[in-house]
């Protein structure tokens, strides 16, 4: 529960935290943000809202964040751009939409982005990822991305892995990313 999370601040070498359950709320994020060496955080099926994500902005060392089945929508995603050192982000079974992806555009250190099981994410949202030049891994599985959305990925020259299972991308859509010479997956 939230009150138990205060104990995490007493673990000076703690780097990875996985929290799940609806009894984890915004209040608990106050304590999580105070873990001095926090690097990776996984929030699965929690009740954390925009206020809780806003509290994480003081977690300077946070490089990896997973939001799985959490109450994450576009208004909550806007706080992610306050995490300038974030390198890996997973948005799984969230309420995020294409419009919400604009809040990721400033995450220039992002190297991996996994968005899956998100029917409200389509090609129009992919345009917001076009300037994430350090992106090496992008997963858009089980989204509404189609051929037209892939045109926005042309400038991601460091992209090595692109996962598109469960999308409406066809062979002709893949022509948009054919010039990405570092793609291996």
Listing of model-derived features with the role each one plays in the protein:
Residues 1-185:
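Concave beta-strand-loop units of leucine-rich repeat
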């Amino acid at each position: 529960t939230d009150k138990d999370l205060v104990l995490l601040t007493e673990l000076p070498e703690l780097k990875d935290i996985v929290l799940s359950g609806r009894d984890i709320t915004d209040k608990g994020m106050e304590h999580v943000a105070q873990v001095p060496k926090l690097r990776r955080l996984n929030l699965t099926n929690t009740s954390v809202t925009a206020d809780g994500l806003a509290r994480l902005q003081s977690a300077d060392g946070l490089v990896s964040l997973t939001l799985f089945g959490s109450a994450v929508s576009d208004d909550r995603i806007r706080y992610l751009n306050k995490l300038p050192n974030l390198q890996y982000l997973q948005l799984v079974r969230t309420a995020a939409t294409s419009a919400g992806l604009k809040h990721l555009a400033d995450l220039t250190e992002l190297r991996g982005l996994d968005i899956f099981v998100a029917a409200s994410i389509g090609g129009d949202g992919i345009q917001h990822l076009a300037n994430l030049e350090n992106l090496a891994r992008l997963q858009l599985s089980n989204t509404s991305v189609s051929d037209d959305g892939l045109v926005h990925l042309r400038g991601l020259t460091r992209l090595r892995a692109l996962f598109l299972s469960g999308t409406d991308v066809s062979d002709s859509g893949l022509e948009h990313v054919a010039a990405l010479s570092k793609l291996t997956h």
